[in-house]
Every structure is written in C-alpha cells, then in structure tokens.
Amino acid sequence: MENIVITNTSGGGGGGVPSSSTDPPNNTTTTTATASAIDLNMSLSPFLSSPSLSSPSIQSAKKKTIEDFIIGKVLGEGSYGAVVLGTEKETQQQYAIKILEKKQIIKENKIKYVQIEKEIFCKSNHPNIVKLFFTFRSEQCLYYVLELCSQGDLLHQIKKVGSFDYRSCQYYVAEIISGLEHLHSLGIVHRDLKPENILMSSDLHVKITDFGTGKILPPPQSSQQQQQQQQQQQQLPTNSSGNLSSLLNNVNNLSVSTDLTQQQQNRTSSVDSASTTDSMISPNLQPTTTTTNNNNNNNNNNNNNNNNTAAGSNTNTNTNTNINTNINANINNIKTTEIPKLTRNNSFVGTAEYVSPELISNKETSTDSDLWALGCIIYQMASGRVPFRGKTEFLTFQKVSNRELVYPINMNPVIKDLVEKLLVIKPTDRLGSSSTPGGFDNLKAHPFFQDFNWSSLSNMSHPPPPIQPPQEKIIFDGDELFSPSLDCTTPRNNNVDENHQQNSCNNNNNNNNNINNINNNNNSSSNNISNSNSNSNSSNNLNISNGNLSTPRSSSSSSSQQPTQRSGSSGGSRDGGSSSNNISKWLNNGENVIYQGLVWKRKGFSIKKRQLILTDTPRLIYIDPKKMELKGEIPWSDSIKPKLKSNNNFVIKTPKRKYLLEDVAHNPQKWVDSIKSVILSSGSSN
C-alpha cells in the first residue's frame, strides 16, 4: 500500500473555529462561488475542544489538519466524496477519512445536505452507527474523520456466504433495528438504507453510515403551536398578492441557512447538555445566488411587504404591483440549480431496489420509509437476492409501486411473515411504524425474535454468531437447479453517494446435495435459511464481464470500503456484449477496446472513480461509471510512459502531466503491461 502525505493545506483553513481574523465577512454583494465558499466554511467548521455526541473519545482541543494524517488507499465512496484510509501520525490510530471537495459541493448545490450529514453524525451516539471523531477543512476540501470499519459492508458479507443462516440473520437484523430505532427516536430518516450503507466493524458488528440523503424531521408541534400556525394561515390574503407572497417566501428560503438549526441544536443539548459543539449551520449565511445592490433592496422591500401582509395590514394596487415586480426580479436572479430546493422534501432519493412506494409517488417521506428498506434488506439477507428488480430503473419502480415480488419456494415462513409485514404499501401499516402504539416494540415482538435477547446488544464485547450459509440452498421457481452456479447480482448504484461496485459470484459446490435436501426436507426447521448466489448485473452501470474483456475475481476479496471490479483482460475486439454496447458511443469507427477497468483517479485533493478504457487507435479515455458520461482523455504521444507505483497504484506520465491512478481490481501491473504493449505495437506500425 502506498502512503501519500498531503502537505499543501491552507494555513488558516486547516482546522479550528472560524473567527473574524481568518474568515472574510459575509458581504451582501458577492459572487456565487465566493459566497458559497464562505458559507461552507462557516457551516462546516471543526469541533471545539469538547467532543461531539457521536465522539466520546476525542482527546484534546488541538486543532486537527490533514497534515496530522498519512493518507493511504481509497476505501470507497460516500454520498459526496471519496473515503480514504487515514493513519494519525501521533497515535498510529487508523480512521476512514471522507474527503469532500468544496467546489464540487457548491457546483452540485449540496451544501445543505453536507450540513445535514454532519449534524446527523453529531446527534447519533450509538454502537451500531458509525462515529464521527473529527472534522476540519483545508482551502480546497472538507474532511470527516470517521470510525474505520475494516470488514467491508453487509453486501460483501451476503455475497461471501450467499445468504445468512437463521441465527446470523436474526442477530444482524436485530443490530440494524437497534441502530434504526435510535435514529428514529431523534427524528432522523436515513432514506437510503441498504446493505452497502451498513458497514461491519473489525469485530463484525453493524455500523450504519452514509447520511448524505438523510432527513431530520421537525419536532412534533404542540396544540398551541398548531393553533398559532392556523391563525397565521387565516391572516394571509386569499388574492393573488397572497399567493405571490407565499412564492416569495419560498424563493427567499433558497439559502444554505435553515430555521431548523436552532431546533436541532436545542435537541442536541437536551440529549447531553455537557457536550458542546460549534454551530454547524450558521443562521446568518447568505444565499448562494449572485445578487446586486438593487436586488438586495428589492429583497428588503419584499420582506417588508410580507411582514405587513402577515400582520393583516391593508394592501393596495401599488403594493401588489411592487410585490409582482420584486418577485420577478428575485426569480430572474435565482440559479436554475437551486429550484430543486423548493421540492427537496418530495424529491426522489435513495436506491431503486430499496426505495419505498411513497418516495416514488413523491409523497412526503417519514421514518416508515426506512422500515420498507429494512424489509428489503431482510429479504436479501435470507435469499441472496433483492426483492424488486427490473431490467431498467423505471421497471424496478413499477415493481416496487405494485409490490411485485416473488418469494423463494423454500423460504423460511417466519422470515417471510416478517418481510410481509414490512413490505406494506401503506406506510403506517408497516410493522414498527411510529404512527401505531408500540412502534419498534411491535417489531421486536415478532416471532422471528422469539428467543432473542435484546439486552445482549448493549454488550458489544460479546461476539456475534458466525456469519455462515444455511444448510440448504434456497431455490426460486424457474431456477436451473443443476447449474453449477447461478448469476450473481448487486443492486444498481442509483444514488450520488453510492459506494459499491459489481463483484464476482460465489460458486455453490453442493448443488446436488442441496437439491436432495429440498426434496427430502419440505418441512425443514425454521432455523434453516437457504443459500443463494443469485443477483443480476445492473443495466445502468458499466459491465465489463462479458466476452473476453473480463476476468472474474474471487468475491472473498470484495469490500464496500475497497470496492472491487472485475478488470478487463486483453481483448482485441469488441464482441457485441453489453460492455461493448455501453461504451460504443465513445469509440470511433473501427476502434477496438484493448483493456478497461475501474480506477481511482487522483488529482491533488480530488479522488474520483472512473472507468478507464484503453483502445487500439491508441487512446486512453475515462468515463464516469455512474452518470455514464465521458469525463476526459489522457493525451497520447510517443513520450507517454506508464509506471508501476505500488501494489495498487500506477502512474501514466505525459509531457504535461502525471496521472496518478489506483486500480480498483488491485492489478496495476496489467495496466502498465497493456499500455506498454500498445506503445510497442503502435510504434512498429509507424
């Protein structure tokens, strides 16, 4: 493993709380990028000397910077950035460091959600939720120093064994429920709960992570607050000026600040008044849009008009005209990228295979949405397959909305009953719903947990049961029973903050014995859950496993924190497989793929996952494997030189730049050899 020490952090931005001496003031007239960068620094300032709720082990008030860590290999991807292995120089303690580029956050208009993720980490103090230890920043990046989970993710564990036996399934579902119950008690909805976002600690305990799409629900209103809100609504005019005023309020709320901030801080202090952190979202942050002095005056006029209207004052034609004019002025100055903020609470987030029906239909999400995802996870742990999968994302959504799922013919009836009670279309009817008396207690009382000791979860030193496959193989109607192996699947990677790539299948060497068990043991014990190696390739992600372009790797080496991809093997032509069809639009006529695979592309503080493609023309192009967009090309010349750097890393030197790359498949030598081979062949042809 190659260790890379990052030294060129900014002197004033490496850590600590922003002060007037280091942070520029918030000017009302500024450019979008400058204002956003200032807001981002203020919103995501590092911790004070006191630890956060999530981090009881923070030792001192010393301000951390990236210079305090040795940066190692890439572990994976979070919602808005790469995650790398970081070793603290002073203690040699290892962490997972999430690196977020400021300019990327601003460009994608994700400031609000980065703030929310940090706030959720700070609020959460539970053994089954990943801990946040430090946050700090440099001039270019924000850094989250997180608990390292060295055993990968739950999906990796499922793929190792095919499916979980009854005892291991019971234990790990209980740990997920324990962490989920804690989140929901704080009013937190994960909204993207899935096996890839459930990590495994070194001692194989569940750690829920990745809150980039999470949501913090407002605290329930008292009857007095509800009456006040109704009175305010009755005071609003019903004419067009009232509607325009309402729109103006929405437009003015397009800011990185939020009224929810103080409520969240109050909730945090009520959990532990001794724990103090700095304000995570500054109440005085300015909108990220570019404004002028005239527009600022318009904003002031709008606010005055709105206040008068809310107070029940009389409005005349001139006032209505001013409101119309000012609203149009504000709307014209709003960037189109900010409009989604108006409907964020109703927008689609999550991953298609685990998303709940109410999110697809654009209804308001709630904690009950996570219960649907829990049902999908239990189904997958018990069967090895996701319950809902279509050939396209749209068809998957249709299956979810219509609840079209098929159970294995020999699925344990107790587990099936639990899944049935969670995968319910109406959110409030799901087992464990907060809208029903009992809530999570009802879920814990299900017969699946009949002999489970819930109090044992508080003792994390107690080892969990071994993760192992059941005694009999699970069978779906229509499976080819005598096939030596079934296709392996991972869920499609539809979210911006996903961190897992397709890995190879497990082969079942005991199919004939398993088939005999199915025939002879129709009334098998409820403790036996079948094994399955089934899943299918995503149609949305690059697939390089077809034809002679790929060589499968053993699934035992996969990990969510070290995402792996089957690397391409030398193949002189496109063979018409799905891989070739997916990338053909970026190839010229007669151009053939020589080698391709996933790499981590490093440039300064930026770490991006890319699909690198070597062709015979020759060319080296790289593609965003999620968005399926061409991102760039490494310029080819007679002086291009590939060089091996370590077991994972290689460098491609061009006259103007060095490209530092890390092979996700851990075979950088294959890249070096392939490029050298093309260099020789192109030289001989010339």
UniProtKB/Swiss-Prot annotation:
One of its GO terms (molecular function) is protein kinase activity. ATP binds at residues 79-81, 98, 147-149, 153, 196, 210. CDD domains: PH_PDK1, STKc_PDK1. It is an enzyme of class 2 (transferase). GO terms for cellular component: cytoplasmic vesicle; plasma membrane. Residues 69-449 form the Protein kinase domain. PROSITE patterns: PROTEIN_KINASE_ATP, PROTEIN_KINASE_DOM, PROTEIN_KINASE_ST. Residues 18-31, 222-257, 268-279, 288-321, 503-568 have a biased composition (Low complexity). Signal peptide: none annotated. The keyword Nuclease does not apply. One of its GO terms (biological process) is sorocarp development. The active site is at residue 192. Residues 1-31, 211-321, 481-584 are annotated as: Disordered. Its EC number is 2.7.11.1. Keywords: ATP-binding, Kinase, Nucleotide-binding, Serine/threonine-protein kinase, Transferase. Residues 593-682 form the PH domain. Residues 100-144 are annotated as: PIF-pocket. Residues 258-267 have a biased composition (Polar residues). SUPFAM superfamilies: PH domain-like (SSF50729), Protein kinase-like (PK-like) (SSF56112). It catalyses: L-seryl-[protein] + ATP = O-phospho-L-seryl-[protein] + ADP + H(+); L-threonyl-[protein] + ATP = O-phospho-L-threonyl-[protein] + ADP + H(+). Belongs to the protein kinase superfamily. AGC Ser/Thr protein kinase family. PDPK1 subfamily. The PIF-pocket is a small lobe in the catalytic domain required by the enzyme for the binding to the hydrophobic motif of its substrates. It is an allosteric regulatory site that can accommodate small compounds acting as allosteric inhibitors. This is Probable serine/threonine-protein kinase pdkA. It comes from Dictyostelium discoideum. The lineage of its organism: Eukaryota, Amoebozoa, Evosea, Eumycetozoa, Dictyostelia.
